[in-house]
């Protein structure tokens, strides 16, 4: 399964990473890598939760 990850930089310099196909999967980070890692971890939790229910 492939999902799109969108990354933007906020005005305050933080990065935000979002998976549009998974509502609520949105994560901030001080760096792009940090935001991506947090969004990936959250996406995995959301997908695992969906499989359990």
What are these regions (language model features)?
Residues 33-34:
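N-terminal amphipathic alpha-helical interaction or autoinhibitory segments
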């Amino acid at each position: 399964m492939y999902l799109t990850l969108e990354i933007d930089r906020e005005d305050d310099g933080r990065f935000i990473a979002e998976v549009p196909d998974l509502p609520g999967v949105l994560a901030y980070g001080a760096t792009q890598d940090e935001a991506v890692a947090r969004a990936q971890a959250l996406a995995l939790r959301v997908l695992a939760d969906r499989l359990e229910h």
